[in-house]
Amino acid sequence: MEQKQEKFSTIGYIAAALGMCIGTGNVWRFPRVCAANGGGAFIIAWTIAMLVFAVPLLSTEMAFGKKTRLGCIGTFRDAGGKKYTWMGFFVAAVCFFLMSYYCVLQGYCMKYAVNSVTSAFKPNLSTETTSAMWTAFTDSQAQVILFHAIGFALACFIVYQGIAGGIEKFCKVAIPALFIILVGLAIYAVTLNGASQGLQYLFTVKKEYILSPNTWIQAFIQAAWSTGAGWGFIITYANYVGEEEDVPTSCLIMGLGLSLIHISEPTRLALIS
C-alpha cells in the first residue's frame, strides 16, 4: 500500500519557510548594507525589490514545486525539459555549499547561546574582552568542531522527526520566539540615549542614494539574500504543501514577515550602536 506523504499545515508551512529565509542575510547583512546605502532610501528600494522580484520568484518556485512534487533537479527537468536539468544540479550544488557555510555559523551561535546561559557575558563588557573571547573560541579547534557537531546533530534530529513532528513543530515555536526577541530588543533600543538620532539616521530618505544605481543593485541583491529566492529551497518545501494552499498569499505573508524582521533588526543595531 502506498504510504501517504506528510503535508505542512498552512501555518506550519509559512513558519518553516520563514525559518528557511531568516538567517545571516537578514540579521547580519541587512543592517550593514542598509546603513551603507542611505538608510531610508535603501529600505524603499529593498521593499520594491521584494515586491517585483523576490515574492514573484518565490511564488514561481512554490508553484513549480507544488505541481511537480519533485526535488530541485527533477523540477527543472520536468518544467524546462532535459536540457535544463543541469540548472537543477547547479542549484542543488549551491545549496550544499551554503549548508556547509551555515553549519559553521550554527556552531558559533550554539557557543554564544551557551555563553549567554552560563553568564559568560556580563554587563558592560569591553570590546577587548569580547574580542579575546571570540579569539579564544575560534583558536580552539576542539571547541569549534564540538559546537559545529552539536548544531548539526540537532538539525538532523529535527529533520529525522519528519514534517509535522519535526520541522513544523519546531518552527511553530522557534519563529514566534524569534519575532518576540527581535521586537523586544528593538523596543529596548528605543529607550536608550540617542534613540531619536539613530531613528533619523536609519529612516531619512536621502535623494543622492535613492537616485544611485548602486543602491538599487544592492537592494535587489539583498532581496535575494533575504528570501532565498532562486536557491531552490521553496521548490523542495512546496512538495509538502496541500493542493488547497494559495501560492501568492503564502509568499506575500512570508514577505511581510521578513519585512518585520528587517525593520526591527536594523532599528535595534542603529540605536544600540
Question: Can you name each region flagged by the protein language model?
Answer:
Residues 171-227:
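Helix-loop-helix hairpins and the membrane-proximal interhelical loops
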Residues 12-48, 232-241, 249-252, 256-259:
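Transmembrane helix-boundary motif of multi-pass solute transporters/channels
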Residues 158-176, 198, 211-216, 229-261:
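Hydrophobic, small-residue-rich membrane helices and short re-entrant helix-turn-helix hairpins
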Residues 261-273:
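Single conserved hydrophobic/aromatic residue that forms the stacking wall/gate
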Residues 46-53, 94-101, 108-114, 147-160, ...:
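Hydrophobic core segments of alpha-helical transmembrane domains in multi-pass membrane transport
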Residues 5, 34-60, 143-144:
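Extracellular loop-to-transmembrane helix junctions
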Residues 1-28, 57-62, 66-78, 85-89, ...:
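Membrane-interface "cap" regions at the ends of multi-pass membrane proteins
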Residues 4, 32-37, 73-89, 104-160, ...:
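Inter-helical loop and helix-membrane interface segments of multi-pass membrane transporters/permeases
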